[in-house]
């Protein structure tokens, strides 16, 4: 056999090296994930985000072959968890269940260490839902138009409660306040359950409540839902009209939950995660659990999620500015 000339060796050797690197790279990509994945949660254990993500993570782990490890990092309206996620290595081993609060509302109210448009990769949309406008069954307001008429007649006797400043309920109330030029007072409480207790006790005339917080009372008949603030009717309250249907065309005030990672997740990581999460979101048991918690499914592609963040950042920015909403 003839010896390979030095010139030919110089050509072949680099080519072999490149092929070797490509093979190694391909092998590494095929192995993702090869260790547990951290799922950061910006609230305490047992909250809405935790309840939503656990069955999803459990089923997704069976598809991708690795477990999810829950890490709770509450504080600052869940912005701490998003900041941690933004600074994580974009290797697919740090994900985060976030929501519209720290993603599109808080950035309009305070200076944050992250940019919701530049620092994250949107992976999967989980679900969303509006708030319910609720009154006691003995209220003089029998429907949303009746409530507005009463509030206009004597604004000093009317106020609305919410779970706190800057929440979707508060901002929905400010939108309605502006549309009808009501001039009624916002009464923020420290959470959804305390707010429900106050409206039940007659201390506030009506409430913008999450469906989950008010569902038991609505079902029992101790609270009456006049309308929901999402664009579409809720699966939980199919007989309750939306504000859009009640004459406020285009009215849409809803919270949503999604799964994100740091900016720059590799294509091979997205190719594993996106189909896996999407498959789980079609599971009837997962859908039922999400509906029971007061949310509706919101199937979206990562590109559609990008567009939603842009749209909602602008929308809530306008509402916050017009209502002069100040951070707590």
Positions of PLM-derived features:
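Bacterial N-terminal signal peptides that target proteins for export
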Residues: 2-15
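An extracytoplasmic/periplasmic, membrane-proximal ligand-sensing/linker region
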Residues: 34-36, 178, 182, 219, ...
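Extracytoplasmic/secreted proteins, especially bacterial periplasmic and envelope-associated proteins
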Residues: 51, 55, 59, 80, ...
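Hinge/capping helix and adjacent helix->loop/strand transition within the periplasmic-binding protein
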Residues: 87-93, 100, 108-194, 243, ...
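C-terminal lobe and pocket-closing loops
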Residues: 128, 214-282, 311-314
């Amino acid at each position: 056999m003839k010896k390979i000339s030095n010139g030919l060796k110089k050509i072949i050797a680099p080519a072999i090296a490149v092929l070797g690197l490509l093979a190694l790279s391909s092998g590494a990509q095929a192995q993702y994930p090869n260790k547990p994945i951290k799922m950061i949660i910006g609230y305490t254990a047992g909250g809405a985000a935790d309840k939503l993500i656990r069955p999803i993570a459990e089923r997704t782990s069976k598809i991708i072959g690795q477990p999810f490890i829950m890490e709770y990092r509450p504080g600052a309206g869940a912005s701490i968890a998003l900041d941690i996620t933004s600074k994580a290595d974009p290797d697919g081993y740090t994900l985060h269940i976030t929501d519209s609060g720290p993603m599109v509302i808080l950035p309009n109210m305070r200076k944050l260490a992250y940019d919701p448009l530049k620092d994250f990769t949107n992976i999967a949309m989980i679900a969303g839902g509006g708030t319910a406008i609720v009154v006691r069954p003995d209220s003089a307001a029998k429907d949303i138009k009746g409530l507005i008429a009463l509030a206009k007649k004597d604004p000093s006797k009317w106020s609305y409660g919410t779970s706190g400043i800057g929440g979707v309920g508060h901002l929905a109330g400010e939108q309605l306040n502006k549309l009808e030029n009501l001039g009624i007072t916002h009464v923020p409480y420290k959470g959804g359950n305390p707010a429900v207790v106050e409206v039940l006790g007659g201390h506030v005339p009506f409430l913008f409540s999450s469906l989950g917080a008010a569902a038991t009372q609505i079902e029992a008949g101790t609270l009456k839902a006049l309308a929901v603030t999402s664009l579409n009717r809720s699966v939980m309250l199919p007989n309750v009209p939306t504000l859009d249907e009640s004459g406020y065309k285009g009215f849409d005030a809803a919270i949503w939950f999604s799964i994100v990672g740091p900016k720059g997740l590799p294509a091979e990581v997205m190719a594993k995660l996106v189909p896996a999460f999407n498959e789980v979101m079609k599971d009837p048991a997962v859908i039922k659990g999400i509906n029971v918690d007061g949310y509706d499914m919101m199937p979206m592609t990562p590109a559609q999620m990008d567009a939603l963040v842009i749209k909602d950042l602008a929308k809530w920015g306008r509402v916050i500015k017009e209502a002069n909403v100040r951070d707590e």
